[in-house]
Amino acid sequence: MGSRIKQNPETTFEVYVEVAYPRTGGTLSDPEVQRQFPEDYSDQEVLQTLTKFCFPFYVDSLTVSQVGQNFTFVLTDIDSKQRFGFCRLSSGAKSCFCILSYLPWFEVFYKLLNILADYTTKRQENQWNELLETLHKLPIPDPGVSVHLSVHSYFTVPDTRELPSIPENRNLTEYFVAVDVNNMLHLYASMLYERRILIICSKLSTLTACIHGSAAMLYPMYWQHVYIPVLPPHLLDYCCAPMPYLIGIHLSLMEKVRNMALDDVVILNVDTNTLETPFDDLQSLPNDVISSLKNRLKKVSTTTGDGVARAFLKAQAAFFGSYRNALKIEPEEPITFCEEAFVSHYRSGAMRQFLQNATQLQLFKQFIDGRLDLLNSGEGFSDVFEEEINMGEYAGSDKLYHQWLSTVRKGSGAILNTVKTKANPAMKTVYKFAKDHAKMGIKEVKNRLKQKDIAENGCAPTPEEQLPKTAPSPLVEAKDPKLREDRRPITVHFGQVRPPRPHVVKRPKSNIAVEGRRTSVPSPEQPQPYRTLRESDSAEGDEAESPEQQVRKSTGPVPAPPDRAASIDLLEDVFSNLDMEAALQPLGQAKSLEDLRAPKDLREQPGTFDYQRLDLGGSERSRGVTVALKLTHPYNKLWSLGQDDMAIPSKPPAASPEKPSALLGNSLALPRRPQNRDSILNPSDKEEVPTPTLGSITIPRPQGRKTPELGIVPPPPIPRPAKLQAAGAALGDVSERLQTDRDRRAALSPGLLPGVVPQGPTELLQPLSPGPGAAGTSSDALLALLDPLSTAWSGSTLPSRPATPNVATPFTPQFSFPPAGTPTPFPQPPLNPFVPSMPAAPPTLPLVSTPAGPFGAPPASLGPAFASGLLLSSAGFCAPHRSQPNLSALSMPNLFGQMPMGTHTSPLQPLGPPAVAPSRIRTLPLARSSARAAETKQGLALRPGDPPLLPPRPPQGLEPTLQPSAPQQARDPFEDLLQKTKQDVSPSPALAPAPDSVEQLRKQWETFE
């Protein structure tokens, strides 16, 4: 590759000498060798040359005290290989210690010279001999190996294949400190054009460091012309040589050099940091490459490490990285390089002009010849330059490089035959070369895409896997866009149930999965297309597999990103109690809530119940995944079925956190009809209504808590009077009360419907017409519902629900659902973890459970307030487009005294038996004999634009049923308030007109008169 470094020297160093000026008669003569090792070294020509290079300055110069201590010169042997002379000047520059070696170990030999100088000063001859003998007999160690020469002398072998770094590399460090960026760029351009270059400095260590450092920036190319890091006085005529050179001159010799005829010489003065050049080499280079290089060098982050060297390496790759596209590969023929193809590849005029000149440069020719020699000899090569080309894709080299590999594959028959017969080592090298670079290219591109994906999503893939998995082949994923879509980062999936997967995983076309890790790498025989990191894992197998692959093979907890670790740890008890059949599908990974869409045709989706999809027949808004509960009580098995914990209609009182399910009675069923997600939501309510399945989240519980606690995602900021946050606050004026009720309209969840219906399969779909002709028993039940002062409601205890009759109570209004068009529902586990699943329900009926309330046998401490409304998923059925009944929270000291104050707008808490409100916004507090009337809670209010859920007015004969009972003689404390607001209360125009007597009766009932 044009390197002038000898690859396998026989010894670590050739000779060690101590050179000094002998004093004869008070005058200085030529320097002489005072001592040498080994003593039998017989190359007198080398020894004479060493003595002159050890003092490359005028000894009687005034600047002799500034020469510094360590410097390096270079001697070229007959094979054009460089031998480095590492020197250390003594104080006063009268003597010099020098080691001549083929190894460019600058820091190592500088350290050894200091030790040897110390031994010489202290006259420790034994240590001096022992150190030199050990070093001279030492076999050349491998890079990175620590070598111990004596008790106090050891070193680590440097790796010359790596990029030089700051401050480890002494030459690059001094060069970067001494020369500014602009002069470095000018010097770099002059070296690319192979100019005659002189570098001047008054300090020898800095001078030689600048020469070696600037030449190292040409990697992977090497300066092929005259190379003299420090020029001795007897060779000053080299400055007039017509060929290109790179020479360093001490400042004491520069005055004589100025008197020479120097034509077209680039001079860099390091002391003054100035550069003189008659050429416009920097301006003639492609501007985009130079601008990028300049920006990288000026960044503070590149001042340490290999940033400076890598910046120049990127520039070299941008200039010459497409050389591989010009390689001509023919079967049974040596690989050659086509200069025309190399130049014509680029469209830019500046780049074409530069490359046309570059093909004539000696350093580029030596580089190409070195690469071709390695390929044709069968050795091959792989270095940081090739890695940079693969990673950077400079000048479209990635695409053309794979075209080159395709060309290799087209002649695969001849190549494979050649490899098998081992007749042509060049073809065998091409095969290995192409395979190695295919591996390198895939790895580097995926690493770049991985970094880009992490930057965009803010989350890395899961770091480890728990079970062996069968990874689908990339070709299967490329053909199946659904698989590719499903393999998104877990940050996108989290919070949404995935659509069902096929139960049988497609078998990979190639055996690329072993113990759950992808180990196959694209080869020239079987190319694999580039895929983003979301579609494929790393070829090395050290990146994590996608979460979907883990879900397919395991019914255990799904691994989550590191930031979710705390929440996922809480799932161990939930999933450990799963009791599923083998036929059930694995739980699909969750998606984000933005991707929720209602099914277009719900009849096409089969109603199969498993814990992967909870509601195949309804909208996806009713789905949920338990993500943050760790249950330690016996009811965790009900929660582990995958039901959304956000849909629990009630919170058990703190006095009895673990009531047995026997106290809560049986669960009840309600017919559900499919509807789209927007059928019962106004546009203004879609963002503000905290529905249990969309707006609610679950707060992760502390480990010590036993009962679940619900959290509500706060709606957009709404002005809310402070009196709503206290139970016993004063009412305030009428306008404030009305404004408060308007502000609370958004809190009414359309999915919160009170009441229950019979469980019989025949009565589930029986309609109850709300038309004007409805009367009789249905009217009696609905009219009884309108009476908030019913004795059954005001009683402290409620009768148990009969086991056999399927008759609705006066407090459980039936809902009219037309029997036609109702799809076949399917069972669903109860939403309340404390209520067992309904065992006798038909398999095609949806179960939306509710606390048993008045129909069970609640403890006396619970009171009638546990007759909570049935909580429905807002997207689970098609209710008529009408408002829901107002739920008035009554004064239940034994229950509401324990409820948190922040839950007064939550649709999740029990609100007692319902009371139907008029069309205007109004809250009907009920006067009770209890002295705690001040603790009355505010109920949920209706929207004024929606008609109330009211039946038609009853006949005149039924009017006495609306008359209030005994409590009407007691003066209502809110009578004055309601009298003032009576003019605002009017029946909704959507209702059928009723007689005046009914109107008066209704107003009389509303005002408790």
Curated annotation (Swiss-Prot):
Span(s) of short sequence motif Clathrin box: 569-578
Q: Where is the dDENN domain?
A: 300-378
Q: Which stretches does the entry tag as region Disordered?
A: 453-564, 648-714, 796-831, 928-1009
Example of a GO MF term: guanyl-nucleotide exchange factor activity
Membrane topology according to the record: Peripheral membrane protein
The annotated regions of Low complexity compositional bias extend over 986-997
Known regulation of activity: The guanine nucleotide exchange factor (GEF) activity is autoinhibited. Autoinhibition may be the result of intramolecular interaction between the DENN domain and the C-terminus, which is disrupted upon phosphorylation. Activation is regulated by Akt activation.
What top-level branch of life does the organism fall under?
A: Eukaryota
Gene3D superfamilies in UniProt: 3.30.450.200, 3.40.50.11500, 6.10.140.1000
Q: Name one GO cellular component term.
A: presynaptic membrane
Please report the stretch or stretches of sequence annotated as the cDENN domain. Answer: 162-298
**Which disease annotation does the entry carry?**
Genetic variants in DENND1A may play a role in susceptibility to polycystic ovary syndrome (PCOS), the most common endocrine disease among premenopausal women. PCOS is a complex disorder characterized by infertility, hirsutism, obesity, various menstrual disturbances, and enlarged ovaries studded with atretic follicles.
Summarize the subunit comment.
Interacts with RAB35. Interacts with clathrin and with the adapter protein complex 2, AP-2. Interacts with ITSN1 and SH3GL2. Interacts (when phosphorylated) with YWHAE.
What is the protein's given name?
Answer: DENN domain-containing protein 1A
Q: Which organism is it from?
A: Homo sapiens (Human)
